[in-house]
Amino acid sequence: MPILYEIEYNYMLNSILLLTSFLGTAVPNDADSTVFKTVGLSEVTVVEFKKSKENLATNSVSVVDSGFINRHELQSITELTAVVPNFYMPEYGSKQNTPVYIRGVGAKTKGSAVGFYVDGIPHFENSSFDVDMSNIASVTVFRGPQGTLYGRNAIGGIINVTTVSPLTYQGTQFKLGYGSHNDALFQFSHYNKLGSKMGYSVAGGYHYNDGFHRNMFTNKYADQLKDAYGRVALVWLLDNKWFLRVNSMLDYSNQGGYPYGKYNRLTGETEPVNYNRYSSYRRLLSTSGVNIRYAGENISFSSQTAFQYIRDRQGIDQDFTSNDTYFVKNRLKQTMLSQEFILKSNNSSRYQWLWGAFAMSQHINNTVETQYITKDNAFPTHYRIPVNALAIYHQSTIKLFSGFSFIAGLRWDYENSTLKYLRETYQLSTDGARTEVKNVNSSLHFNQITPKFALQYQDECNNNSYYFSVTRGYKAGGFNQTFQKEEETSFGPEYNWNYELGGKVHLLKDKLYAEAALYYIDWRQQQVNQTVPGVGNVIHNAGHSSSKGFELALNSSPLKNLSIALSYGYTYAKFIEYQKSAKLNYSGNMLPMVPRNTLSCSASYALYPSSTSFIDKIVLTAGLTGLGKIYWAEDNEVAQNFYALLNAKISITSGIFTWECWGKNITDTHYNTYSFKSSADYAQIGKPAYFGTSLLVKF
């Protein structure tokens, strides 16, 4: 075992042994047992069918609450991988690359196939997904198409992040942390009420890390991280029927990135990072939103207005070698304004309905410059891509008889986008005059209707439910921001039919909750990403694909103050028909970037020492997540076999102070988190074992 890791192991072990000398007899706290009955089982579970927009969905919906997030030290949304079954959000490259895959449905670049919302504000670009997880009340993951319930259609599902409300929690918190690789963290939050019906919150933080991957050429870490954020919110209950929420977030990241080393297919070994130019990514992300709601006796209304601004800059040594061959600069500015209206029934009648309308205007200005150092020339390419979208959706639920209900929904989508493309060239050494190489002006229009049908049975006596649903998914096409051939300028829409059979049951007097689902996805014209050396990512449409599998989630509280969660997902996703070219036929191959298995096991136990101890509470948490097998490209020539990561945390509370110690990938499992083929095979090694400690002050 490396010396550094051995010291850190001994440090945590000695801390735990020292702790036991201060413990009295562990006496369960009856007040806390109530919390476990009402909250513990819902940490990673499926939302029940209640009269809310979210719970009208007749498919798998998993919720991760703030307790689970804090006990497992989840600092990024990517750490929900495998915690939610068949959910995969790989962490590689930089924050610019944050793809999401649910049941094999996803997109590596150019617009996610999974919708992402933070307090009702949509995030449409992958580069805006990786945000800080502090002060999060819950993360809800909807698996399967959600077009009849959410604004912009998401062919794979929805991630809905909700922050803490100052009307439900008041207090001030400071957190100071330090860990391996010089990881430093500072966070603060303040929640307060101005009277009985108005509240405000202010939160912020800073995170620094030296990095995990050393560049052998520069002898410096390639993936240093500096991140700062701030959030403000105002919540106002105008009266018993009207509600107003105004919130804004600003996030700035400056990081080294793309720590890729050469990968040897024969030995399965990945070499250290070794390229001559520093690669980096900087992102400024700003989001603001206004939500107005009305809840009457028979109807409810919601209006969500949102604005998002992204400005980022990428620099990448795209030959990934010590040779000074070529370097790529990528600068992007995006603005997005969206409006969503929802009107739905709000009573207990046999017929429930929901109507929604969504409009969006997005403007992207992007400049990608490829510098060919050895040839002493550069090719800057300028893109202007405005996108306008409009959608109207409806869902009806009819209660039939004896607990049976029939659900039908319909969605209409319209989207148009235009491309203004200008490619130039100039001499690098002189930074001379630009010469036009290519000029393209083009436009695209998409129009689509997608239905949904479902039958559900609700056993109200035991609070169990069962369902079967058939849903059509759709994702519009668009323009490639890099291309070599005329036919690569744009790509078409993709479609799927999602068939699902599932059930959700409470057992053993509500001490065990179980959820299971079987699904089959028939996928047409899948949007597939191809990495072109020196050019970037190009999207094209495959012919016919399928994804089938099942999911199982168990949550139990067998003893007071003990909660156990288990989730497993299996996905078998392959190309049924994919003739890429005259010579390349990938029909029958597995889809890339899709784990065959996802596994998560976790347990948390709270102890309450006797009144003679100065310690109020101790929480012990351990979790294991597993993934694999994952193919990295359509040719299925390189893959990552199944691997598992073990994490643990202990927190000790005394009065207003809480001390935490945690470790991630404790067994120092070696695995690749991403791989691709360029001039050679390259891969990024996953994070090694690392540890940390933090002090929280709450008052």
Regions found by a protein language model. Give the residues of each.
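Short, acidic, small-residue-rich periplasmic hinge/interaction motif at the N-terminus
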Residues: 28-70
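Conserved C-terminal beta-signal and adjacent last beta-strands/turns
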Residues: 332, 336-348, 352-356, 396, ...
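Short acidic/polar hinge/loop motifs at secondary-structure boundaries
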Residues: 119-145
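Gram-negative outer-membrane beta-barrel transporters
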Residues: 354, 406, 414, 520-522, ...
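Structural signature of Gram-negative outer-membrane beta-barrels, strongest in the C-terminal barrel
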Residues: 234-239, 249, 343-346, 350-352, ...
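Membrane-embedded beta-barrel scaffold of Gram-negative outer-membrane proteins
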Residues: 291-318, 458-475, 490-548, 557, ...
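N-terminal periplasmic accessory domains that precede
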Residues: 77-80, 99-104, 117, 141, ...
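Transmembrane beta-barrel wall of Gram-negative outer-membrane proteins
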Residues: 171, 178-209, 217-255, 284-290, ...
